[in-house]
Regions:
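Amphipathic alpha-helical segments that form well-ordered structural scaffolds
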Residues: 49-57, 129
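Phosphate-binding glycine-rich loops and adjacent basic patches that engage nucleotide phosphates
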Residues: 2-19, 59-61, 90-96, 119-121, ...
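A short coil-to-beta-strand element that immediately follows conserved catalytic motifs
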Residues: 61-69, 108-109
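Membrane-targeting and insertion segments and their boundary/processing signals
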Residues: 24-28, 67, 117, 131
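Short N-terminal helix-initiation segments at or just after the protein's N-terminus
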Residues: 32-45, 59-60, 98-108, 173-174
Length: 174
């Protein structure tokens, strides 16, 4: 309980985040969980069809790969205001969110919030099923805290379209 309180208090002074995540790209490349269905999603977001689609929709040239992370936001989970710079971001071109949340109510929070340079909210996007959102980075954004009374989790796969080396195949198992 103390750790959670410290985390929330610290988020008021600097970037804070609290959610469950599974970093799909390194898991795929390192051969963890061979045959796991989530690896098909990693392969899909790195397919020429998806990468070319993302490049066309965003007008961003040079897209060569996509990172992927499965996210699960419980009541109280959030991501504070940030712009995706830093953290190995040098090759990030465009962020994406693929929504897997059904029947979400706006008062449950969890919206992807896009901010202007002063931090004012320009747009809030409700978690939805089968919705793909792109936005160029760096761009100020956050995820609103999920309300304590939300009836289920906010689930999505997020990542970045990048211009660095394409995702390699997982190692062959002997």
């Amino acid at each position: 309980r103390q750790v959670m309180g410290d985390l929330r208090q610290g988020a008021g002074r600097a970037l804070g985040l609290l959610y469950l995540g599974y970093n799909m790209s390194p898991a795929y490349q390192n051969g963890r969980g061979p045959g796991h269905p989530i690896h098909r999603v990693t392969e899909f977001v790195n397919s020429p069809e998806f990468l070319n689609f993302g490049a066309r929709v965003t007008g961003q040239a040079g897209v060569r790969k996509a990172d992927a992370q499965a996210t699960f936001y419980r009541p109280g989970d959030f991501i504070g205001l940030h712009d995706d710079s830093g953290w190995e971001s040098g090759n990030r071109l465009t962020a994406y969110t693929l929504g897997f949340t059904r029947e979400w109510r706006s008062d449950w929070g969890g919206q992807l919030l896009l901010h202007d340079d002063r931090g004012d909210i320009e747009r809030g996007l409700l978690p939805r099923w089968n919705t793909l959102t792109f936005f160029r980075v760096p761009r100020l954004h956050s995820v609103a805290p999920v309300a304590a009374y939300a009836q289920w989790a906010r689930i999505s796969i997020v990542g970045w379209l990048r211009d660095d080396e394409p995702l390699g195949a997982p190692p062959k198992r002997s």
